[in-house]
Structure formats: C-alpha cells, structure tokens
Design a protein with these regions (language model features):
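Structured segments of extracytoplasmic/periplasmic soluble domains
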Residues: 1-12, 103, 107, 203-206
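Propeptide-to-catalytic entry region of secreted or membrane-anchored zinc metalloproteases
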Residues: 1-51, 55-59
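Extracellular/periplasmic catalytic domains that process cell-envelope and extracellular macromolecules
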Residues: 10, 42-49, 71-76, 160-175
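Short catalytic/ligand-binding loop motif for oxyanion handling, primarily in non-cytosolic enzymes
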Residues: 25-27, 61-62, 113, 190
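Active-site-proximal segment of zinc-dependent metalloprotease catalytic domains
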Residues: 41-114
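The catalytic-center signature of Zn2+-dependent metalloproteases
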Residues: 87-190
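A recurrent domain-boundary module in secreted/ectodomain proteins
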Residues: 192-207
C-alpha cells in the first residue's frame, strides 16, 4: 500500500510513511453499513497531523460496496476508509492513491458526466467538453485532464477506452485511462496530470 502510494505520488515529490498501526477492537466497524458508522469510525483513534486510514472488511455506507471513501478538505470528519479487498493487491495498486487524491481535494475526472441521454450524449450541465471549452469551470475544473464520460466498464484489459459516447458538441471522447482520479480499470491507473499535482501540493501546504 505505502509503496504503491509513494510510486504514484513520486511525480509530485511526495513521500509517505507509516507512522503507526492501531487495531480497533470493535465488531461494529468490521462492516460499515451507513454513513453514521463511517463517521464514527473516522473519529476513532485519530492521530493529528497525519492521514488516518482505516481498513475494514466491507465498506457499503450507501448500500453499495465501495473500495474506498475519503474526506475532502472541507469535510467535517476527516480520514480515509478502505475495504480490505481493495487494499495493496497486485491487481489493484491504485485505489489508495485515488482516495488520497480526494483527500488532497482532487475531483473525479468524470465529474459532471453522469447524465447521458438516450442517444449516448453526455449532456450534464457541468460536463466537460472534449474541445476544452470552459474547462476551468467544467468537469474536474482542470484543463490538462481530458474530458471523461466516466470510464467505469469502458476500459479493456489493454487499458483502451471502448466507449462510444459523445459530448454536448457531438465530439467523441478520448479520455486518459491512466489517470488516477478516473474510474478506469484499477490496474491501468498510475498518473496524475501536472495541474492535479499542483493542487495536491497547494492543498498540502495551505490546508
């Protein structure tokens, strides 16, 4: 986990290390079923001035199993919770880095792209356009991450995008399947853009 994290964040010149390990002897937190449990866990055994990461057997606060969930800078309760099935595995080296990206205030590259009409057009009110129009105010608000229609189920084993969605201008998507903040295949994700790295550093130094 830490080795993968350090590899993924090397471009931002960040290095992480494990400060300590605590076992929470409470069966309530083995399986997280709702957001109250999630917040209660993230207020347990908190170590200040560090990223508190909690590993549980099953993480399904909204009824659907998740690999991980993280706070943002503005969140009332801080910390990252990971499902053990998604932590530090050869076929999933990226989920922890993805969640730490959220911790540093990065958005999904497909932010705003959840709405699709019956013709396969991504027409969400905040969806980023392929040509980059108003890119600093759409999607993830970054201009060096290509428009992303949400890559879940649309990336093959060669890390190629297989979808055929078009944006509100009728342009076909050419997303970055390697970006850590996407929903690409977990084995494919290993990069941040320069603007993403800038946000990571800014958040670290100013929050």
């Amino acid at each position: 986990g830490i080795n993968d994290l350090n590899y993924m964040y090397s471009g931002a010149n960040l290095y992480f290390y494990q400060l300590s390990f605590d076992y929470i002897d409470n069966d309530v937190y083995v399986q997280i079923d709702d957001y109250d449990e999630l917040d209660a866990l993230r207020t347990t055994n908190v170590i200040e001035n560090s990223i508190n990461i909690y590993i549980v057997a099953d993480l399904a606060p909204g009824g659907e199993s998740l690999c991980g969930i993280s706070s943002f800078v503005s969140s009332d309760v801080q910390g990252i919770v990971m499902a053990e099935s998604c932590f530090a595995l050869p076929d999933n080296p990226s989920t922890l880095s993805h969640e730490v990206g959220h911790y540093f205030n990065l958005l999904h590259t497909h932010t705003g792209s959840s709405d699709q009409n019956e013709d396969g057009i991504i027409d969400g009110s905040n969806a980023e356009y392929v040509d980059g129009t108003d890119c600093s105010n759409r999607g993830d608000d970054l201009c060096d991450t290509p428009a992303d229609p949400n890559l879940g189920d649309f990336v093959n084993s060669q890390c190629e995008y297989t979808g055929d969605y078009v944006d509100g201008h009728g342009d076909s998507y050419n997303p970055d399947t390697s970006n850590l903040m996407s929903y690409s295949e977990k084995i494919c994700r290993n990069t941040f853009s320069l603007e993403q790295e800038d946000i990571i550093i800014y958040t670290l130094l100013n929050s």
